[in-house]
Every structure is written in structure tokens, then in C-alpha cells.
Amino acid sequence: MARGSEMKIGERQGAPDDTPIFISSPLTLADIAVPSSPFENRVPDQSDRPRRPLHPETLAIRTQTARGAEREHSTPLFLTSSFVFDDAEQARALFTEEIAGNIYSRYSNPNTDEFVRKMALLEGAEDGIAFASGMAAVFGSMAAYLKSGDHVVASRALFGSTHQLFTKLFPRWGISSSYVDADASADAWAAAVLPTTKVLFVETPSNPGLALIDLEMLGRLAADRRLMLVVDNCFTTPILQQPMKWGAHLVVHSAMKFIDGQGRVLGGVVVGSAELIAELRFFIRHTGPAMSPFNAWVLSKSLETLSVRMDRHCSNALAVATHFEQHAELDFVRYPYLASHRDHALALKQMSAGGGIVVLELKGGLERARRFLDAVELLSHTPNLGDVRSIVTHPTSTTHSKLSEAERVQVGIVPGLIRISVGLEHRSDIIWDIEQALARSA
């Protein structure tokens, strides 16, 4: 694809525009409702009509908790800490897990169940579980399966708190880690695997450098060496990339970013096979990092507009990246769907669009970056991303400040690096603000 050309979300190389971007087997209207679950199919019965696969836009809207006696059209908020038993026998059977049902909102709640069901469907997973935050989800995705003496191989380019988890916290419990560069060969990844290695952990694209990792290659390695592949899919959402298609066992999201899309609530989610999620459910039930029903209700509503928002995020980000790619005040511009990006071919292979993040390096280093941040007028200066509002962040002094200078250099975080989360404003207004901030900070 030529630099600057656009691809609509959902399009694939060689696929018609209306082809569902689902992975695994096609999902149908009947698949929205699972027998003996609280989910129902809110589409009129079509049992006498041909079954057809549903697109993610439809699944994100039509997957809902079963209607109550009031026959509400929109899922209500279930603000309750616990649920009433019909009788003593039901209480016993629920706690022994002989029957399914709600007991306590730390274990399950109709709102969290609906949100998780949607995320699992969008990622092509069997099951999932919601967490109080993205980092709680990252921690749980490994802590539930690792023990003292185990080893993790991770991509070197990681979010700052994830890096701290591997380097500062896990070693306290006897869990060691090794890092591999994102652009390393398959042989280099294989060489990092030890007899004690249990997990491969990556984020792609990486935060903040937008390095991509070949998920198909890692999926083969995980299968060959019987490892669990965990992928942080936060930057792309399941609308743009489905890691389980390439062999991932668990997919992790910080839901407070693009999933929410408006910077309102905290949340995280992990999806995967029913067997792995059962182990994770035991972990969360007895350690407590559960998502609140209110946050789940907000996030489930947010998923209804995710594909529409991601379309605008991506088209705006591509426009911003293209506009500034040759700018005289910048040393580089990184965006996966620019032909100049090192991993452009890989982006076309495993992502259906380039995402909503653009990275710039300003000439003038740290002081220039500070002046730029102080000069923006429209864009928000905050450490979040994935918002409808465009956001600028300086990773060196914020999200990755706990890394040493040498560690930052290793993953390409230089003093002049600015991460821009491109929002849904008119693209000309976003470009104007970046232009005037560059001029004023010169």
C-alpha cells in the first residue's frame, strides 16, 4: 500500500469490503446467546432463515444481558454487591459450582459478564474475565499461571509499569525474565527460551515506540516449545488485530484506553480459552482485582461504537503522520501504516489499519519537548491514550520515567520523543495545533 493511502477498517488484502474480520469459525445470530447463560439474542428469531456470520460491529451492539421483567431495550446497571438465593439448596449448589449463576459481584455480575462476553466474541476467544485496571489484567495474566522458578521471555519494548512488574516485582517471588528486541529473528526468540520458560509476553504495537512483533512467528514458537503466548492488544483493539488468529493463548487489554474511548473509567480484560480463563477466574475470585459493575456497564456501552471510533482514529492518525513525515522540525515520524515504518509490511499483514497512535521525535531533545508540551492549545497533556480527545505525552518524563536512561535508549525512547494519541476532532484542527506548537517551541 502506498504511503498515505487509506484502508477502511474491516478490509483485508484480497477480501471484499463486507467480509467479517472475524477469526476462527464464523459466528452467527445463534452464537450471541449461549445456552444456560444470562445472554440472549436480541435479534428477532431467524431459525427458519439461513444462518449467516455476523460482523464485529453487530456483535458489539447485539450481545446483551437477558431482558428483565420490564423488557428494557438497553441493558440496565446492576449496582449490587451480592445476589439473593432462592433457597438453601441453590446457595449450596452455586458455591460448589454445580450450577451457574451470580453470587457476589466480585465473582460475577450481569454487567461485567456482558462486557466480557463482547470482548471474547470480538477477539474470537472462548471466554474472558474483567479486571479493575489494565495493569491488574497484565499481572493476572501471568501471576495466575507462574510460580517460583519459572521464567518469562518478553519483548524489550514494553509499557513502563509492565517493565517494572518484570524487573522489580516478579523477582521477589522467584520469577525471572529475559528480554528480546522487537525486531529480533525467530532464532533469537527461540534462543531466549530456557527449560524453565513458561510464558512469552509481548505488546504489539509497542508503547510508545510502535515497534511491531511477528505474531505468527511467536505463535509457532509457543506451539513448538509448549509455551503460553500472552499478547497485550491495547493499542489496536480487536477491531484492528486479533492475536489469537496467530496462536496467542491469552489476549490482554487496558480497557480504559480505546475500549472506553472517553477517558472515564478504569478497567482491564483478559480473554482466551475456557480452560485458561477458569484458572484465571480462580485467581481473581480469591485475590479480588475485579471490575466494578458501573465500569463494566460503561465499557460495554463503549464497545457499541468501537468500530466507528477506530475508523476515525485511524484515518485521522494516518493524516497526521503523513502531514508531518517530512517536517523540518522533526527527526522522525512513526506510524505503522506509513511505508517508511520499519515494520510496515508486518502491519499490513496482521493489522487491518494503522491505529490511533503517532510518534514524533522533535529536534532539540528534552528542552524542545518540554516547550512543545507547554505550547499545545487544543491537544490535552495527560498520560492516557485512546480518547476521543487528542493527547500528547512525553514518555521520558512520565510513563517510562522509572526506566534507566540505558533502558529507554534500548527501546528507542529518546528525550525528544512525543506520543500523540490522535482523537476524533477534525484532522485539520489537530494538525494546526501540532504545527503551531512546533513553531512556538522552536
Model-derived features with residue positions:
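Conserved C-terminal alpha-helix-loop-beta "cap" of PLP-dependent enzymes
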Residues: 332-418, 422, 430-432
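Glycine-rich beta-alpha junction loops
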Residues: 65, 79-85, 235, 257, ...
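Acidic-histidine catalytic/liganding microenvironments
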Residues: 122, 324-328, 376
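Conserved N-terminal alpha-helix of the aminotransferase class I/II PLP-enzyme fold
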Residues: 87-136, 161-169
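N-terminal "arm"/small-domain region of PLP-dependent enzymes with the aminotransferase-like
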Residues: 31-109, 117
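A common structural junction motif
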Residues: 288-289, 376-386, 437-442
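PLP-dependent enzyme catalytic core of the Aspartate aminotransferase-like
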Residues: 3-6, 22-23, 27-42, 167-168, ...
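Conserved PLP-enzyme active-site core in the AAT-like
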Residues: 32-41, 47-51, 60-66, 127-327
